[in-house]
Amino acid sequence: MASYASEVKKELTSLEVHPEHAKAELAAFLRMNGVLNLHDHQFSLDITTENPAIARRIFKLIKVAYGIEPLLIVSRKMKLKKNNQYLVRLNQQVQEILENLQIWDTEKGLVTRIPKRIMSSREGAMSYLRGAFLAGGSVNNPETSRYHLEIYSTYEDHNEDLAKLMNEYFYLNAKMTKRRRGYIVYLKEAEKIGDFLHIVGALNAMLNFEDLRIMRDMRNSVNRLVNCDTANMKKTASASAKQVEDIQLIQKEKGLDDLSEKLQILANFRLAHPELTLKEVADQIPDGPISKSGVNHRFKKLHEIAESLRE
């Protein structure tokens, strides 16, 4: 059974590739997952994934953005996992493409920050975030887990830029933290996770997420009400048991006839109805209805009498 995150990524990979946005999405893939090789004085760039839909997406992004068809190599992992492994290899115009995407600088080498042209464009930011999520993102199933969406990045400054895109353009309240050999930017608020899914184009996943979130919140609300009712019932039962105990002691030691009329009425009513709450006693007592505070005052009087008999 596919994970929730896999379903989200499946939807994203099925989106149409727009020529004007392809480079921003591709830049995220290459910056986060690309491996640069040098053989016989020639550069090649590899991106490896176990997700065939993501491999096809990368292939199409390169073709749309630069008119080049990269190699697509499929191999089978023979160890513990038996999933196919998909390698997209670019071996034409590698340096030119990396420079065009501002991933490589001839003087500085690898550029890990997100280019200003993407940082300054809302549409570019949306496409880059889509690529970043496909390259290194995950999201928990809102039905079974705590709310959590994250994107992993090797470089701290790249992680900072991802958070900046999320917060300055889309107000997602993204947070950052170190994770093993890299960094993550993450979201914990259900509403913000839904917003992110909408931003990157996973509309069906967003609607599904919202449905699951609403159902989960409703279940939690019902559980809270049930727990509250249970606690109140226990509290009522405990208070009633103590009141009955006081009345039975008075009845045994001196009899209820010795009490004032109001206390007699309450004592007999409580013995007959130990299950009632304080409010129900106040509403249903034969000489009532009276206020809860009035009933409580009478019970205190009975308790004082019982305590004097215990001494």
Curated annotation (Swiss-Prot):
DNA-binding region: 277-311
Species this protein is from: Lactobacillus acidophilus (strain ATCC 700396 / NCK56 / N2 / NCFM)
Keyword Iron: no
Record GO biological process: cell division; regulation of sporulation
GO molecular function, one term: DNA binding
SUPFAM superfamilies in alphabetical order: Homing endonucleases
Name of protein: Probable cell division protein WhiA
The protein's role, per its UniProt record: Involved in cell division and chromosome segregation.
Keywords: Cell cycle, Cell division, DNA-binding
Entry's family note: Belongs to the WhiA family.
